[in-house]
Amino acid sequence: MQKIAFHLNSLQQGGAERVVSNLANRFAKEGYEVVIATEWYGTDEFALDQKVRRVHVGLTKEDENRSRISKMLRRIWYLRRFMKKEKPDVVVAFTRGVLYRALAAGIGTGIPVVISVRTDPVGHYDKKADKLRIPLLFPHAAGCVFQTEGAKAFFAPYLQENSRIILNPLNPKYVGVPEPAVRTKNVVQSGRLVDFKNQPMLIRAFLKVHEKHPDYTLKIYGPDSKDGTKEIL
């Protein structure tokens, strides 16, 4: 295998985006040809090694006035066109909607598509639309990556048997960081303010801890996803 393609919506800072940027940069340094296909360009994106190519496969300005179904089909077509032109040895897709798009685009191309489930399937892969798309598209996956046994167990046996559990990669720059001479009494959570990370539950739980340990402080770091979570907090 010499050429690896990653597909996700953008490289705007988030968990899946961080993993893709780290993997892409590392594979490039190892001598692989790496290309990342994204739907759009976000603000405050992760940096890529100069050896990593990025290709836009999202909608054009002319597509904005199309119907929802037409936009969905265009996204699949643009990605399929990218795959046939680039001819990667494998496509690795991250995040829920992207998985379906990549699998649909890859049908008949002969290019293996590996999908990566990054979130708790309960609440994210159990909606009516998922129950229709998963049986149609997931059998086409060349493999699946999960982060936990629980996530793996959610899916059908055929997918479990064709999967691996791989933890998030750790950037070497964070290894061996010296511990502070004096620890502060802070509980820190880092991540986007978004519904599935459930920061409201964290706050409710911390309030109970704070009753017994009033000298502790909770600090939450992360950008606003604009889904209403910030307002709830």
List the model feature ranges, each with a label.
Residues 17-22, 185, 194-211, 231:
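A conserved mid-protein helix/loop that constitutes part of the nucleotide-sugar donor-binding site
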Residues 6-14, 18-20, 26-66, 154-156, ...:
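N-terminal strand-loop element at the rim of the active site
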Residues 1-3, 173-187, 210-213:
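Nucleotide-sugar donor-binding and catalytic loop/hinge architecture
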Residues 93-99, 117:
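Short His-centered aromatic/hydrophobic patch
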Residues 69-77, 109-112, 119-140, 146-147, ...:
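Nucleotide-sugar donor phosphate/pyrophosphate-binding loop at the beta->alpha transition
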Residues 150, 169:
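Carbohydrate-associated surface elements
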Residues 64-90, 100, 104, 128-132, ...:
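An amphipathic, basic-hydrophobic alpha-helix
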Residues 45-47, 212, 219-233:
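Short, structured helix-loop element that forms part of the nucleotide-activated donor/catalytic region
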